[in-house]
Amino acid sequence: MASLIYRQLLTNSYTVELSDEINTIGSEKSQNVTINPGPFAQTNYAPVVLESWEVNDSTTIEPVLDGPYQPTSFKPPSDYWILLNPTNQQVVLEGTNKTDIWVALLLVEPNVTNQSRQYTLFGETKQITVENNTNKWKFFEMFRSSVSAEFQHKRTLTSDTKLAGFLKHYNSVWTFHGETPHATTDYSSSTSNLSEVETTIHVEFYIIPRSQESKCVEYINTGLPPMQNTRNIVPVALSSRAVTYQRAQVNEDIIISKTSLWKEMQYNRDIIIRFKFNNSIVKLGGLGYKWSEISFKAANYQYNYLRDGEQVTAHTTCSVNGVNNFSYNGGPLPTHFSVSRYEVIKENSYVYVNYWDDSQAFRNMVYVRSLTANLNSVKCSGGNYNFQLPVGAWPVMSGGAVSLHFAGVTLSTKFTDFVSLNSLRFRFSLTVEDPPFSILRTRVSGLYGLPAFNPNSEHEYYEIARRFSLISLVPSNDDYQTPIMNSVTVRQDLERQLGDLREEFNSLSQEIAMTQLIDLALLPLDMFSMFSGIKSTIDAAKSMATKVMKKFKRSGLATSISELTRSLSNAASSVSRSSSIRSNISSISVWTDVSEQITGSSDSVRNISTQTSASRRLRLREITTQTEGMNFIDISAAVLKTKIDKSTHISPDTLPDIIETESSEKFIPKRAYRVLKDDEVMEADVDGKFFAYKVDTFEEVPFDVDKFVDLVTDSPVISAIIDFKTLKNLNDNYGITRSQALDLIRSDPRVLRDFINQNNPIIKNRIEQLILQCRL
């Protein structure tokens, strides 16, 4: 459980410098920037969610195959097939309205001679004669029309899929009969009181709407989809269909979860955003015919409005990004009218509106997730501006319009001039509208966009309305304020401490004995076996979870340790080094993608960037086809554990800080992987270099791309602990047998230990290089 929570935190929780994101958006003018905030992301490193708003409608999409459900008793709704999926139960279903219909389905296994069997139907013990001389299963449909009558065999379904069906429709009960794969359905028994028919189902079952009856017939005759036959499909109680979902209202506070100190509150709010543009008009010196620049400026606005009877005081700051620079030059003379630069916002521009109000939702906006908004669009039209020349008719700028469309919302630390509080930063994309703008008495006409001359026209403000929603982690005691840690001094002290810890951690590389390292790497490791020697594993997990929420950014090593946890979790209870020591994680799909990428074109494999990408992902394939050899993850984990054990300063509290910014490739950055076919080895490293050579002579041979693709798809991928260069050097200087070469190629830890015990300098040097690469 702890490792699951930790893995989720590593995967989802990181923080983002908002200012960097905004600068990037502005410089690249990108319209598709989406950052997953993760749970409890901090406001002072605000998460960014820029995505389309999904507006719920009343359309309900019914699943074709709903289930499986656990055995139960209930009144099935009319016009829904009950698809019965028994295992070896003798009584599959009982149904009655207690007036004129009693129906039961009995299951009889293949190859049963004529015999009398005892069944309990509707609380009564009955002797019923059954027979099944086929190799398929048989469903016997038994029926009676009164409580005093005896059950009669009505009809039979002979099935190799072992599936049966039951339906209430119109005024009849419907079932299947015949023999698969040609079984059919029609009504079995009529009743005047169909709605009161209650069923007791003794097997797992599915629910299929009658509108999808063709699929039900298909399942009866050919079987369930393969997905339904895996161990991952677990039946649930039918009551799960009756869960009542609380639909969030427009203005309300909902407690999502609560502990002794903290609670998650969902705030749903109506919102009215009023904003206006500001501009700066700078005139050049001289005779008064020339203007230097006319540009947009940030504009603050404060206003009040009613929200469900509550008076709300709101503040907004409007700014623009991605402006377009225009100019006009009427001539070279000092008396010729000209504007050196004037700004226009168009389709490639963005408008940002920071919003804050004094409601409860903004008082604890520190740890926030699930921030969404739904806003309408607004049209902004430009007005007239007169260029007052000393002599002559004045040029007049007029027209121009754009529409603002909601494109995303983030938490913002860019506060308004009125208050220094957390705010919401709404982002709007633009489309140009009619009329175009022009400058009267000049050549400028028919241009689209909103110029900075008079962007508000006659409007005091522009208004956008609708709603927003967020979930905030707040203290359980409403009198407490959520603490905000944004001290520069604290961050500098922390960086200094982390620097000292990294230096100590890296200096310990010289103290690791290689035989000890290999012995340790042979052990089955899971997430917390790396922290043996720490007094409390639980405390370590808690500390790491807390630190990760605060410190982990885009940590590659966080992902690496998460992968290590998944790939080694099954090994914690076994000392075997068999192929089962690695859980078959979701790497296969990742590698399949790589295989398709490589197979697509032989030329693309020869491209250096493609080679690098492929070789880095080779380790995913390696995990799913683990051999008896040692791999890079074993060494990484062993080095990490050894250094922690030797350290005098590293504790569970500081470990997440140390590795917060490290990446998995940096821990052992110079990796190499190989595949083996007969007497030929094909090797790839993360720098994009590929080798092919013979095992006996270490003579290089041409690298066959197609063969390599086939091998990495179908054969085990091995960590090249002793790489090709080291092997060739070892063979040239010492000479090694074919058997030793194969063992070294397979990274056999026993042979590695033998070479180290013999103080072989070439092998020792290679292992030392790997240890020294494990730096932070």
Swiss-Prot record:
A motif (YGL motif) lies at residues 448-450. A motif (KID motif) lies at residues 643-645. Residues 389-409 are annotated as: Hydrophobic. The lineage of its organism: Viruses, Riboviria, Orthornavirae, Duplornaviricota, Resentoviricetes. Residues 248-479 are annotated as: Spike body and stalk (antigen domain). One of its GO terms (cellular component) is host cytoskeleton. Belongs to the rotavirus VP4 family. This is Outer capsid protein VP4. SUPFAM superfamilies: Concanavalin A-like lectins/glucanases, VP4 membrane interaction domain. Residues 65-224 are annotated as: Spike head. Residues 510-776 are annotated as: Spike foot.
